[in-house]
């Protein structure tokens, strides 16, 4: 195991987070200043729960986090986090109603990743599909001037995601956190200044 993997794994364990991904979110927020007290956040692909915990800390008791994943979350969650076990491609009517009731959200974030095959083209294609679905949800439930975070496995069609995001955000920036593994193909795109009433 490489030293940097040891560091973030042990740091997460020591600070009682379920995964090292918490530090990716912290780095993203340090760079872009996305969260404030009292905000509402939607966390897509939330399991095992690190991003929901991180967002809950940032928005405080007056804020709220709605999180969902096809897999369950087993860790205790604070009172300002509501978790729903949902497939975002086949959302139940009850969950859609919750999104309508709780939204629009100040921040929508997706750390979703597909089941990897080891075939880069396949993994990239599946990752892009998740990203575009997350963006479709953001277009429905993100607040005017809100922010969007999405992870993708890099590949030839990443530009498709970027082009789509640029139609709906004033600024779109790529970011690779230091806490990402050096050889990882993952990169995050951050959309700032959502233009809610843009048509495409």
Curated annotation (Swiss-Prot):
A single MF term (Gene Ontology): rRNA (uridine-2'-O-)-methyltransferase activity
CC annotations in GO: cytoplasm
Main location: cytoplasm
Taxonomic source organism: Lawsonia intracellularis (strain PHE/MN1-00)
Protein name, UniProt field: Ribosomal RNA large subunit methyltransferase E
Job of this protein: Specifically methylates the uridine in position 2552 of 23S rRNA at the 2'-O position of the ribose in the fully assembled 50S ribosomal subunit.
Keywords of this entry: Cytoplasm, Methyltransferase, rRNA processing, S-adenosyl-L-methionine, Transferase
Binding residues annotated for S-adenosyl-L-methionine, in chain numbering: 49, 51, 69, 87, 111
Catalytic center residues: 151
Catalytic reaction equation(s): uridine(2552) in 23S rRNA + S-adenosyl-L-methionine = 2'-O-methyluridine(2552) in 23S rRNA + S-adenosyl-L-homocysteine + H(+)
Family: Belongs to the class I-like SAM-binding methyltransferase superfamily. RNA methyltransferase RlmE family.
Keyword Cytoplasm among UniProt keywords: yes
Annotated InterPro entries: RNA_methyltr_RlmE (IPR050082), RNA_MeTrfase_FtsJ_dom (IPR002877), rRNA-MeTfrase_E (IPR015507), SAM-dependent_MTases_sf (IPR029063)
Keyword Cytoplasm: yes
The enzyme's E.C. designation: 2.1.1.166
Subcellular localization(s) per the UniProt record: Cytoplasm
